[in-house]
């Protein structure tokens, strides 16, 4: 596998709709950076958030997940309580080629503040807005800025196409828009 450079990402985004909307240059002035970088793409977080709450003394069960475990927030800023967790999604919609696997890393600006981002790999032929898991590991409230960078995606191209893609498996998160909660 090879990591793909900026010119390949640009070509795939503008010519094949791999990333929409696509920001062709990295935006940095007064914001947490987003857009095309040398070997990746810094995605923006949208203005919709689901923040974990324990109002009903719920237990988190991935096989029987209750949406009541979250409080919905929409706006330009999200405050994640200390030692808590939120779900969000990217502004961008991704369409991953059959011979590409995409991995995600958090932004150093947030990581240096104790805010950790997790996203599972984007599999070949998956498409949708990416649901982002954001953990505030600090004992203080943490501010997340909608419309600004939240994570960086790295595109790894295989030497050949995979035998079975996410689309072939009819994956349960195919075509998702907005925040997707766990599904069985």
Swiss-Prot record:
Pathway: Pyrimidine metabolism; dUMP biosynthesis; dUMP from dCTP (dUTP route): step 1/2. The keyword Oxidoreductase does not apply. InterPro entries: dCTP_deaminase, dUTPase-like_sf, dUTPase_trimeric. GO terms for molecular function: dCTP deaminase activity; nucleotide binding. Gene3D superfamilies: 2.70.40.10. It is an enzyme of class 3 (hydrolase). The keyword Transmembrane does not apply. It catalyses: dCTP + H2O + H(+) = dUTP + NH4(+). Its EC number is 3.5.4.13. Catalyzes the deamination of dCTP to dUTP. Homotrimer. This is dCTP deaminase. It comes from Granulibacter bethesdensis (strain ATCC BAA-1260 / CGDNIH1). The lineage of its organism: Bacteria, Pseudomonadati, Pseudomonadota, Alphaproteobacteria, Acetobacterales. The gene is dcd.
């Amino acid at each position: 596998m090879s990591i793909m450079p900026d010119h390949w990402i640009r070509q795939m985004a503008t010519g094949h709709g791999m990333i929409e909307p696509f920001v062709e240059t990295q935006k940095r002035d007064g914001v947490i950076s987003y857009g095309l970088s040398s070997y990746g793409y810094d995605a923006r977080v949208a203005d919709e958030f689901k923040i974990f709450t324990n109002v009903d003394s719920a237990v988190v069960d991935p096989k029987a997940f209750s949406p009541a475990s979250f409080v919905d927030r929409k706006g330009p800023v999200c405050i994640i309580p200390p030692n808590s967790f939120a779900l969000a999604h990217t502004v961008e919609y991704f369409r991953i080629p059959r011979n590409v696997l995409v991995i995600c890393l958090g932004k150093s600006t947030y990581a240096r503040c104790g805010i950790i981002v997790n996203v599972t790999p984007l599999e070949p032929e998956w498409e949708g807005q990416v649901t982002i898991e954001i953990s505030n590991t600090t004992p203080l409230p943490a501010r997340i800025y909608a419309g600004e960078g939240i994570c960086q995606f790295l595109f790894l191209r295989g030497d050949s196409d995979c035998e079975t893609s996410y689309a072939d498996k009819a994956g349960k998160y195919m075509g998702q828009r907005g925040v997707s909660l766990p599904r069985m």
